Amino acid sequence: MNPHATPVLVLSLALGTTITISSNHWVLAWTGLEINTLAIIPLISKSHHPRAVEAATKYFLTQAAASALVLFSSMTNAWATGQWDITQLNHPTSCLLLTAAIAIKLGLVPFHFWFPEVLQGSPLMTALLLSTLMKFPPLTLLLMTSKSLNPALLTTMALASAALGGWMGLNQTQTRKILAFSSISHLGWIAIILVYNPKLALLTFYLYTIMTSAVFMALNKIKALNLSMILTSWTKTPVLNATLMLVLLSLAGLPPLTGFMPKWLIIQELTKQEMTPAAMAIAMLSLLSLFFYLRLAYHSTITLPPNSSNHMKQWYTSKPPSTPTAILASLSILLLPLSPMIHAIV
């Protein structure tokens, strides 16, 4: 790829995202989503590997179908109510179509099949964009229409996402697929609270973005595409691996770390809404994800690859430190004590 193309594509992603999140008209929102889709496809297929081309094709087909559904939903609503305003989605069929369209775009169960395959075929930094930035515009549309959405449908999809995201991640050895199922599981937590407290859903997404970005950047630094590559990276980058372990435990939602905050607040909010069974179910389903996060953490720090007895360990980092990774990792680990302030601001 031409070196000048990447900045243009990244700027196009920023433009598409900005158009969608700032628009109040369905056609403008749809335009932003289309710009995003067209900008990310060259980044997915950058390596010209058959798997990358396959991933780009799958991504294009699913996103095109979802965009068509968004347009159809908005046209149905405009036909019935005479409104093109995003917040005025009142027609029941339009609400159902929009929920399906956004679920396809986000990769919520049962429309999740494309997401792990596309992530597996993408470079690590493109996979980071797909897991974080590309989910922001569709999620914004869900937040803007949250008053009109069906709570029972979203709760069902959320619980299914948490279950399937945890279950399918158990036997994976590829880091990108593990993080894809982790993303599906986290989307379940966001979807279950979206109708009742949209601001809390947005906070959960922000914290998920910080933690996932830290993991992807650390994996990109050590070039770890599967578990065995993480296993052999400990001798080269011990500090980065130890940090990666803590960030993974934070993603799992263990108490002293940042990732515990959104889970705690969501369970508290669900209990207030008298949805204790749903809160219990999603809390229990998060144990499935905890297993594969622990396995990743175990591989990154606790186990060492088999070496001969005269093998010299390299107790120095072979790669220069990265400031963005350090900042994101610190935020992923240390924000829990600030949770009252963060919750008050949000």
From Swiss-Prot:
It is a multi-pass membrane protein. One of its GO terms (molecular function) is NADH dehydrogenase (ubiquinone) activity. It catalyses: a ubiquinone + NADH + 5 H(+)(in) = a ubiquinol + NAD(+) + 4 H(+)(out). It comes from the Eukaryota. It is found in: Mitochondrion inner membrane. One of its GO terms (cellular component) is mitochondrial inner membrane. InterPro entries: Complex_I_Subunit_2, NADH_DH_su2_C, NADH_UbQ_OxRdtase_chain2, ND/Mrp_TM. Keywords: Electron transport, Membrane, Mitochondrion, Mitochondrion inner membrane, NAD, Respiratory chain, Translocase, Transmembrane, Transmembrane helix, Transport, Ubiquinone. Its EC number is 7.1.1.2. The keyword Oxidoreductase does not apply. The chain crosses the membrane at residues 1-21, 25-45, 60-80, 95-115, 124-144, 149-169, 178-195, 200-219, 242-262, 274-294, 326-346. GO terms for biological process: mitochondrial electron transport, NADH to ubiquinone. Core subunit of the mitochondrial membrane respiratory chain NADH dehydrogenase (Complex I) that is believed to belong to the minimal assembly required for catalysis. Complex I functions in the transfer of electrons from NADH to the respiratory chain. The immediate electron acceptor for the enzyme is believed to be ubiquinone. Belongs to the complex I subunit 2 family. This is NADH-ubiquinone oxidoreductase chain 2. The gene is MT-ND2.
